[in-house]
Amino acid sequence: MPRTLQRRPLLAAVGVLLASISSAAVATPVHDRPGNRLEALIEQPAAQAEAEAEQASARFCTADRQWCVRTAREGDDQASQLEIEHRLSGTEEPQTWFIPLDSADADATGTDQPWPFIVRLAPGVDAGQVPSDPQQAALENVLVGVQRSVTTMYSGGDAGASTLVLSRIRHMDDGIQIDPDVLTLPADGHAMIRACFGEQDSARRAGACHDEYSFHGVLTLDPAGQGMPVLRYATTATRFPVGASRLQDSQARGPLRKQDLRTQTDPTCSFQRVLRFDGGRYQPDTPLPECGEFTEL
């Protein structure tokens, strides 16, 4: 559900670019035809000590310092929020808004980090009501995100998964409207599962005593897009050894051969999609495949 919030100052106590979903590198912003821009955010290391004291992530900002984001916990160890700061020209204090995040899975260790990118929308392209106030209409709307990660330990192994959630921030006549979930995508995943429980297993598996799984997503801005930013999502999923499956008992497999001891790309979960804004959310041009074997704990 959209949230419309009145603008308020930040209180002192609150204190072609490839957008790898989990990391950012300094690069030239990517523009599309209407002028939407995908930019890498810059981590602000000077604020790290303050962030740790406040149970917050580092702050990530645009190069011009107009937009900054971070995640922070507020009392409850399981609850966190995404904080967005917007500094307008000629103002001393930034405006700040908060997006509450659902509690982490009680059976897993969870962390929330800002997505280290921002999509800055070109004037007039944002779908929906255009403010009648010319000053509000001239203000910049953006897409910001948070990467939500969970990890767990197994006997002789471990697993982790992260999800990207994008939110839209747009200026309205009566303040800021926050659409907290316009896109949710698997970002990264990994698992290492123990497969040997004795010397016989080790010999049968040619010494490869763990099954390993990996998933990685990349989100980019389509330079040829029109209107609201068109996004491209590309993933790579792999397994080791050849034929490993979390859906089957590894003990039921036959002996591994030397040629099986290599990383195998999964064709179903290595794919590309085009994402367009429709009905208040980003929708893929074709449905995403079921890839829980790579993207879930």
Where is each model-derived feature located?
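Bacterial N-terminal signal peptides that target proteins for export
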Residues: 2-14
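N-terminal signal peptide c-region/cleavage motif recognized by signal peptidases
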Residues: 19-22
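Acidic, small-residue rich beta-repeat scaffolds with periodic aromatic anchors
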Residues: 27-61, 158-161, 169-297
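A domain-level signal for the mature, folded cores of soluble proteins
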Residues: 51-52, 68-75, 84, 193, ...
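Acidic/hydrophobic-patterned starts of short beta strands in beta-sheet-rich repeat architectures
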Residues: 63-71, 136-150, 224-236
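Short consensus segments that form the blades of beta-propeller domains
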Residues: 70-76, 109, 153-160, 261-267
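Short N-terminal edge-element motif at the start of the domain
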Residues: 72-152
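Eukaryote-skewed repeat-based solenoidal scaffolds used as protein-protein interaction platforms
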Residues: 134-140, 144-165, 177-189
